[in-house]
Amino acid sequence: MSKEMKGQYEPVAEIGVGAYGTVYKARDLQSGKFVALKNVRVQTNENGLPLSTVREVTLLKRLEHFDHPNIVKLMDVCASARTDRETKVTLVFEHVDQDLKTYLSKVPPPGLPLETIKDLMKQFLSGLEFLHLNCIVHRDLKPENILVTSGGQVKLADFGLARIYSCQMALTPVVVTLWYRAPEVLLQSTYATPVDVWSAGCIFAEMFKRKPLFCGNSEADQLCKIFDIIGLPSEEEWPVDVTLPRSAFSPRTQQPVDKFVPEIDAMGADLLLAMLTFSPQKRISASDALLHPFFADDPQACSKQEHFTHICTATDEVK
């Protein structure tokens, strides 16, 4: 942490160590509020920070001005040299005590009420639509990157960090999960905002199942598990700019949604299939997903607090 940041923030607890660095819960000494500090190490060369990292930090500084109820607020970005070969980028976010993974793990049987899932998904897609309208592809959506406040407010985190994270990966031998990655990413094809909608579809199914939908242990295995459910795409749909041919996979037919997500209702099943469409061009957008009949009944009709009173926050507040 830079001298300026040390004078402004007081770390009080380590709350996570992952592929992309260490996250601390800290107190803002000026406001007294808690924040989340994320330290990311970036490899440098003889010319200093890679240009891609400089561009990404510039993007992050622009994101400081974002103000959306379903986006985690980025409050500050600071880069400071640690050695000739390494620079530490410190990101300061608003602090939220639990993520969706923790939240779902606390849900008692038989699972979340349908209205709660509608509420969570509507907020999730609203945040995602906002990112996409601002030309930001998240690339790494998963339950750990979706935060849920004790009052049930959903906030997307870790957006706009893809290039910085790719630099960090050279320094950290941690395997990043493949379970929420879109087929075009697994096939190393070109991709854009539809990759996030695929990930959102996987998370949508997980809200019903309370466990991941596709649990592959390699890119090929992940694709096999996907095709076991959605069926093997046609030759016409298979991307041309990939090294893995369609013939590498055995023929499969699409499974009924109620077979792999038996808890889902008819409208939810229709939306899920639209989100888990193989072709990115045919996959529903976040904006169109928000207009889907699944959300026709207002999820705010019931008291939001009633939905969330049975689920406490992931960690106790540090006094």
Swiss-Prot record:
<comment type="similarity">
    <text>Belongs to the protein kinase superfamily. CMGC Ser/Thr protein kinase family. CDC2/CDKX subfamily.</text>
</comment>
<dbReference type="GO" id="GO:0030332">
    <property type="term" value="F:cyclin binding"/>
</dbReference>
<keyword id="KW-0808">Transferase</keyword>
<feature type="domain" description="Protein kinase">
    <location>
        <begin position="9"/>
        <end position="295"/>
    </location>
</feature>
<comment type="subunit">
    <text>Forms a stable complex with D-type G1 cyclins.</text>
</comment>
<dbReference type="InterPro" id="IPR017441">
    <property type="entry name" value="Protein_kinase_ATP_BS"/>
</dbReference>
<keyword id="KW-0131">Cell cycle</keyword>
<dbReference type="GO" id="GO:0000307">
    <property type="term" value="C:cyclin-dependent protein kinase holoenzyme complex"/>
</dbReference>
<feature type="binding site">
    <location>
        <position position="38"/>
    </location>
    <ligand>
        <name>ATP</name>
    </ligand>
</feature>
<dbReference type="GO" id="GO:0005634">
    <property type="term" value="C:nucleus"/>
</dbReference>
<comment type="function">
    <text>Probably involved in the control of the cell cycle.</text>
</comment>
<feature type="binding site">
    <location>
        <begin position="15"/>
        <end position="23"/>
    </location>
    <ligand>
        <name>ATP</name>
    </ligand>
</feature>
<protein>
    <recommendedName>
        <fullName>Cyclin-dependent kinase 4</fullName>
        <ecNumber>2.7.11.22</ecNumber>
    </recommendedName>
</protein>
<dbReference type="GO" id="GO:0004693">
    <property type="term" value="F:cyclin-dependent protein serine/threonine kinase activity"/>
</dbReference>
<dbReference type="GO" id="GO:0005524">
    <property type="term" value="F:ATP binding"/>
</dbReference>
<dbReference type="GO" id="GO:0005737">
    <property type="term" value="C:cytoplasm"/>
</dbReference>
<dbReference type="InterPro" id="IPR050108">
    <property type="entry name" value="CDK"/>
</dbReference>
<dbReference type="Pfam" id="PF00069">
    <property type="entry name" value="Pkinase"/>
</dbReference>
<feature type="modified residue" description="Phosphothreonine; by CAK">
    <location>
        <position position="172"/>
    </location>
</feature>
<keyword id="KW-0963">Cytoplasm</keyword>
<keyword id="KW-0418">Kinase</keyword>
<keyword id="KW-0597">Phosphoprotein</keyword>
<dbReference type="GO" id="GO:0010468">
    <property type="term" value="P:regulation of gene expression"/>
</dbReference>
<keyword id="KW-0547">Nucleotide-binding</keyword>
<dbReference type="InterPro" id="IPR000719">
    <property type="entry name" value="Prot_kinase_dom"/>
</dbReference>
<keyword id="KW-0723">Serine/threonine-protein kinase</keyword>
<dbReference type="InterPro" id="IPR011009">
    <property type="entry name" value="Kinase-like_dom_sf"/>
</dbReference>
<dbReference type="GO" id="GO:0106310">
    <property type="term" value="F:protein serine kinase activity"/>
</dbReference>
<dbReference type="GO" id="GO:0000082">
    <property type="term" value="P:G1/S transition of mitotic cell cycle"/>
</dbReference>
<dbReference type="GO" id="GO:0010389">
    <property type="term" value="P:regulation of G2/M transition of mitotic cell cycle"/>
</dbReference>
<keyword id="KW-0067">ATP-binding</keyword>
<dbReference type="GO" id="GO:0007165">
    <property type="term" value="P:signal transduction"/>
</dbReference>
<dbReference type="InterPro" id="IPR008271">
    <property type="entry name" value="Ser/Thr_kinase_AS"/>
</dbReference>
<dbReference type="GO" id="GO:0051301">
    <property type="term" value="P:cell division"/>
</dbReference>
<keyword id="KW-0132">Cell division</keyword>
<feature type="active site" description="Proton acceptor">
    <location>
        <position position="140"/>
    </location>
</feature>
